[in-house]
């Protein structure tokens, strides 16, 4: 057996060790043949031969394992050495990530209102009917609910259709004055060139004592905000309807594409609708058990702002993961 011990010691690769193992321990290997030859020996010799073979069997296996470990360690060290990196050398620049244009726009919106002392509030995306509708002056079977195609679960749970429930929960857990915005994802059953089933909103709320908040306050901050976002644009307020505000208004800016002269994007009107706002309806304050207060609220679609800022024609392109498109907004 000395020959096999020498072969193991001299082996220079893991593959060679495997060949030796098969030659020794295979079904037709050396040890199997030696054990088979025992049949020809006497009973006394069989015992002695079996003892010697078992000792060799154990010792050879241990030698194989140890030599294999040694060779594997050597191979690993050589491999690591061949792949060593000189950290002092100049390297080619690697691709770095960047914020999605929707998140860039969201951050810019939050930055403005944070500078105006609005706190940022977040909430759950799965809401109940009360916080999403009833507390906002939208009782069951109210026709205005048809304005929002809702994803429903069981037990009157739903995916929120706006971030207004965050305002309701904030008012129910806090006392005025309140000065907050609620950015986040919302969900509606729409999918076309200007709508997606999931999009982002930022809604704002300011509540103070009765008579302390006026439409003039709302108008001032929204005009300042829109000039911050779009530069030197004209702003106009149009009367509108929202169940949770009274009076209500839609806010338009002069078209950022044609500068108000009229184009296909603005339907030749020279104006683009960008957000809705109004004075909080007394029924909303009643739902959260507020008394002797006044306030204003507003809401905007972040994707809408991103499309106007970056002049993107199709809302759906923001969610398709097109690297060529997204790389333009680094």
Swiss-Prot record:
Protein location: Cytoplasm
InterPro entries: aa-tRNA-synth_II, aa-tRNA-synth_II/BPL/LPL, Phe-tRNA-synth_IIc_asu, Phe-tRNA_ligase_II_N, Phe_tRNA_ligase_alpha1_bac, Phenylalanyl-tRNA_Synthase, tRNA-bd_arm
Listed cofactors: Mg(2+)
Key words, A-Z: Aminoacyl-tRNA synthetase, ATP-binding, Cytoplasm, Ligase, Magnesium, Metal-binding, Nucleotide-binding, Protein biosynthesis
GO MF annotation: an example: ATP binding
Reactions mediated catalytically: tRNA(Phe) + L-phenylalanine + ATP = L-phenylalanyl-tRNA(Phe) + AMP + diphosphate + H(+)
Cystine residue pairs: none
Sequence positions that bind Mg(2+): 246
Primary site of residence: cytoplasm
One GO CC term on file: cytoplasm
Enzyme class: ligase
Record-stated family: Belongs to the class-II aminoacyl-tRNA synthetase family. Phe-tRNA synthetase alpha subunit type 1 subfamily.
Name of the protein in question: Phenylalanine--tRNA ligase alpha subunit
Organism placement in taxonomy: Bacteria, Pseudomonadati, Campylobacterota, Epsilonproteobacteria, Campylobacterales
Gene symbol of the encoding locus: pheS
